[in-house]
Design a protein with these regions (language model features):
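An alpha-helical, amphipathic repeat domain used for nucleic-acid recognition
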Residues: 1-197
Length: 197
């Protein structure tokens, strides 16, 4: 039966290296060491070692995800993609479900905050919808987020901002606003009201 021969500290203060039969086996959190009651001389079956390694992998992925969420709010899909890039694809779903249970991941809250931020930047509803869709947000949640956007006000503000120092070229302004995701039918009345040539 395999025997724990050494537990050494890592650079990360809450983690240790586990050595089994004088060979490095995996890194563990101090919580795992305590819950498994590991010490030098502990005997473990191969099945227990496999479970321990699997738990360690989930724990490491969870800690990475928590740090990632500390940078800014993210959607579930963004966290899954991040863990995939960090080579934790096999445990990404388990980690995301845990983060949701613990309240760290809420796609509805993310979508509301993200769309509000984009509205302040005068994004069109279509551009916000496309971005939230790419971030894995459901259509129902997206529809709730963009329902109250005042497209006309955003277009008028963009026209005013763009024409502050110069006369408005109607065609250029039209291309600019269409490029920002606004529809022709929303842009035309605003341009007519602005008196552009």
């Amino acid at each position: 039966m395999p025997v724990v021969t050494k537990l050494t500290s890592q650079k990360q203060k809450d983690f240790v290296n586990l050595y089994v039969d004088d060979e490095f086996y995996c890194g563990l959190s101090l919580n795992q060491v305590a819950s498994w009651r590991l010490h030098k001389g502990s005997e473990l079956t191969h099945d227990q070692l496999d479970r321990l390694r699997s738990e360690a992998r989930v724990s490491k992925a969870y800690n990475l995800a928590i740090r990632y969420l500390g940078l800014r709010i993210h959607s579930s899909q963004e966290v899954i993609e991040y863990l995939r890039r960090k080579e934790f694809e096999d445990v990404s779903i388990v980690v995301v479900e845990r983060l949701k249970r613990e309240g760290y991941l809420q796609d509805e809250n993310f979508a509301l905050r993200w769309s509000a931020m984009r509205q302040q930047m005068l994004w069109s509803p279509r551009a916000i919808q496309d971005e939230l869709s790419r971030k894995g947000i459901s259509k129902d949640v997206i529809d709730d987020c963009i329902r109250g956007i005042d497209t006309r006000e955003a277009i008028i503000e963009l026209i005013a901002k763009k024409s502050r120092n110069q006369a408005i070229d109607r065609e250029k302004m039209m291309r600019y606003l269409v490029g920002r995701g606004f529809s022709y039918s929303d842009i035309k009345p605003c341009l007519d009201d602005s008196g552009s040539k």
